[in-house]
């Protein structure tokens, strides 16, 4: 499956515990069809102490979510992404509003 989303795109989360939140894509795993959105879908990660003198920690970390659970967001509207050619260059655009991404 091919995706038209890119790192740095502003997306809205469609389902899950963070439904309705807007964030920026931090990373995309194209083989597993997962995206990581900054400060969304946070989980607690336990880090063990490496030496007896150190203490273990619990940190907050973004967990990846399925790519179908996010949609491109711009000017208060979520939309699918299309591709058109202008001057022999591929341009991404929002299908609802027609504006370039």
UniProtKB/Swiss-Prot annotation:
Complex and partners: Part of the 50S ribosomal subunit.
Gene3D superfamilies cross-referenced by the UniProt entry: 2.30.30.30
PROSITE patterns in the cross-refs: RIBOSOMAL_L24
GO CC term (a single one): ribosome
Family: Belongs to the universal ribosomal protein uL24 family.
CDD domains, per database record: KOW_RPL26
Keyword hit for Transferase: no
Pfam name, any one: KOW
Protein name per its UniProtKB record: Large ribosomal subunit protein uL24
GO-annotated biological processes: translation
UniProt-recorded Gene Ontology molecular function terms: rRNA binding; structural constituent of ribosome
């Amino acid at each position: 499956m091919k995706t038209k989303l890119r790192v740095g795109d502003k997306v809205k989360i469609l389902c899950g515990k963070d439904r309705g939140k807007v964030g920026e894509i931090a990373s995309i795993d194209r083989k597993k069809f997962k995206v990581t959105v900054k400060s969304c879908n946070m989980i607690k990660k336990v880090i063990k102490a490496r030496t007896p003198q150190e203490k273990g920690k619990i940190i907050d970390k973004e967990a990846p979510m399925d790519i179908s659970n996010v949609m491109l967001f711009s000017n208060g509207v979520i939309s699918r992404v299309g591709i058109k050619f202008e001057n022999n260059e591929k341009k991404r655009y929002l299908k609802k509003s027609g504006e370039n991404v």
